[in-house]
């Protein structure tokens, strides 16, 4: 396995670790509605940071974006909006299926759809079937899916042992939402694929290869921001128990505390895709679809590890922790199989 591929896998791991931890600051926000908290974090992660970093990277910010036709920008934006819909469905999936089953089904579907649909769309799926390296990467995807399933099972055992249940368990509604979440969340993978002309244009302007994907985030995350912020603002305006004015009428120290923590959560959310871009840049072009598989499987891996570190599994008993550990090992094996396939 080459150093470039190893570093690509490493940066995807770092990005996934940030994704697994980003909600921790949000949990410490006090006396704010989820909608206000999510909006503040989202403005930081989907608008301020993508625009600020792109302005630093590009020699002429406006000239860069105006150089693309609507036919180039629109698919990137719409796939970003597609991801935004998946993001909202994610929370609803947890409500109706519970954390473990919801995450397992949604992540499993988005891992498959986001990874395999890209080469199908590009018309080069035959390369995966007809080459040794392609077949090995497909095997890695399958092993990763098995690892996600094992971690999901560990979560179910933990919830059963600790008496944790879904907020409003509804299998039929939850499965529909989980499938929708999985499909729509893959929009981020499709957006990165559609944004290749933007990456190439950034490279032509002298942007470092590690950073060429970052300017496209202005458009991708702009699409996601409209969906997420629109959802939050509509609820803040229509739901009687929610009030943006009330949330910002608290004592100033508490408002500062909440804004700071929400912004930190937004920063950590953005960093997952900052390092995703670094990892993506190190993956061989013919295997760039594997970035999504690495990100999602490492997200599950890091989520399990973070749960252990935060002692969320302390009262779960030995068996769930053993199953979780097995799932994490399987995901690590999957990453190595994929790495060897890309190096073949």
From Swiss-Prot:
Alphabetical list of Pfam families matching this protein: RhaT (PF06379)
MF GO annotations: rhamnose transmembrane transporter activity; symporter activity
Highest taxon in the source lineage: Bacteria
Ordered alphabetically, the record's keywords are: Cell inner membrane, Cell membrane, Membrane, Sugar transport, Symport, Transmembrane, Transmembrane helix, Transport
Q: Where in the cell is it found?
A: Cell inner membrane
Listed under catalytic activity are: L-rhamnopyranose(in) + H(+)(in) = L-rhamnopyranose(out) + H(+)(out)
Q: Does the keyword Magnesium apply?
A: no
GO CC annotations, alphabetized: plasma membrane
Major subcellular site: membrane
Please list every transmembrane segment annotated in the UniProt record, as residue ranges.
Answer: 4-24, 38-58, 68-88, 101-121, 137-157, 175-195, 214-234, 259-279, 290-310, 323-343
Please report the record's description of how this protein sits within the membrane.
Answer: Multi-pass membrane protein
What InterPro entries does UniProt report for this protein, alphabetically?
L-rhamnose-proton_sym_RhaT
What NCBIfam families would the database entry show? PRK13499.1-1, PRK13499.1-3, RhaT
Q: Which family does it belong to?
A: Belongs to the L-rhamnose transporter (TC 2.A.7.6) family.
The UniProt function text for this chain reads: Uptake of L-rhamnose across the cytoplasmic membrane with the concomitant transport of protons into the cell (symport system).
Q: What is this protein called?
A: L-rhamnose-proton symporter
Species of origin reads Escherichia coli O17:K52:H18 (strain UMN026 / ExPEC)
- Name the gene for this chain: rhaT
